[in-house]
Each structure stands twice: as structure tokens, then as C-alpha cells.
Amino acid sequence: FIDQMPPGMRDTLYFKDDDSRLSFLQGNYVTLTNMSEKDMNRIVRYRLEPINISFQTTNPELRCKMLHNRFAGEALKKVDILYQGGIEMNGQIVLCRGVNDGEELERSIRDLTQYLPLLRSVSVVPVGLSKYRDGLYPLEPFTKEEAKEVIRTIEKWQKKVYAEYGIHFIHAGDEWYLLAEEEVPEEERYDGYLQLENGVGMLRLLFNEFEEGYAKLEDGVHQEEISLATAKLAYPYLERMAKKMEEKYKGLKVHTYCIRNDFFGERITVSG
């Protein structure tokens, strides 16, 4: 996404933080492409876990193409060092339409199950497409039906893995459910929200916390007006919660505004 940033912003926003130390300290996802065997052994020696890995695919040739790095395929072997060293990991697959979806996604999930249970979770999230894509690979956003297919694939593998390991392992980012216009899974499916900051389970946690707080409220009168701003995907859900609050408190008016993203482009439909 850094290659899709608008020009003229502060320098730190263009910094590609592919650093295992930041993965350990801040949860960054790393590709392992710039790490030596010595670096990997240091992670094992000092127990710098969990390490968050951006896989994208387990197809070595395709990974080289996606990351524009001729060592990207070979870098996948470094996961074996972490696994053999007993290091806990989380992973992500940024899905690109027509590139690493479909059969490639099936292959990636199947390959990554060999690292269970040390690879605790893998999220599948759609690639973000800003309006600043000059010179980049021509990608298109996923359709509603394609989002449904991604969900079906993930849920199929969740059932397989859960039957053997008791965890769901592979998780769909919230955006897939919003795009497919399906309800997000129940809390139990998120295995303790291991990838919350990666956009996996945020809506379910919000819904549950809202209902928990709502159940404690007493009916009353509040002559207030409140404004909420959000982006396209979450808008109907926040609007639904706002209406429920208006029914609870007579006189309360909640205005929910759906904001079009002109800064990054209209195809960026999430807010954080």
C-alpha cells in the first residue's frame, strides 16, 4: 500500500517497515525477504515471538512476482527455521483478484496448515486499492459474488482445521463479510481475536460490546444530537446501532454520515 500513497506527505509515511523487530514490538507483518539465517536464529535464541508474517502465497514463483523480489520464494523456507525453533507465528494473505485467489488461495491455506499449531492464525484480507496506482499492476476490486466464494473457501478450511486442532486458524477479514453482505461470524470463531488490528473481528467485537453496554442502559430522555462519521462498508451497521439508541432514549438524535474517501480514492471504503 505504501506504493499507492499520495505524493507530498511526510517522509515517515513512505517507510517500508519490513523489520522483524517491529513485528515483535508493534505487530508489523514482515515478508522475511531481507532476513539472513543469522537473523532467523536470533529470533529463535531470544524468543522474539509471535512473529507476524506476510505470506501472500506459498507458490514461490508467484510470491517473487507479487513482492517484486527474486528471493521472495526462497524466503518461505525461513518459516521452517521458526517452526523448528518453536516460535509462535501469525500470518496474513493479502488477496489480489485474479492473482493469488481461487486455486492459489486453496494451495496457500493447505501448505500453511503444516505449521500448525505454532502458526496460530492466518488472516485473508482484500488488497486496498487507492487512486494512486500509476505504473503498478492493474488490479480490480473483488465483486460481491467473489467475496462470497472467498468466505466459503475459508469456512471450509476452518471446519477441517477445527476438527483436528480445536482452533479455526484461517480467518476472513471483516471486509469480505461486508462486501458479501453477510453477517460476521460469532465471537467463538475468532479464537480470541488474534488478528484484531488486522481488521479481523473488529465488527463482531463492536457488536458484542455495544449489546453488552446497551443491556445495562435504562430507558430515559436525552435531548441531544450526536454525529458519527464512518466509511461506506461499516455505515449500515453503525446506522443500525444509532437507530437502536434513538429508540432507547427519547429525544436523542444520532446522525450517521457515510464519508466518501477523496483522499485515497473512492475504492478505499473502510475507516479505522
What residue spans do the PLM features occupy?
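Conserved Radical SAM active-site core
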Residues: F1-L118, G128-W157
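Auxiliary Fe-S-binding modules of radical SAM enzymes
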Residues: Y115, L129-G272
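Conserved residues at the C-terminal ends of beta-strands
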Residues: S54, V125, G173
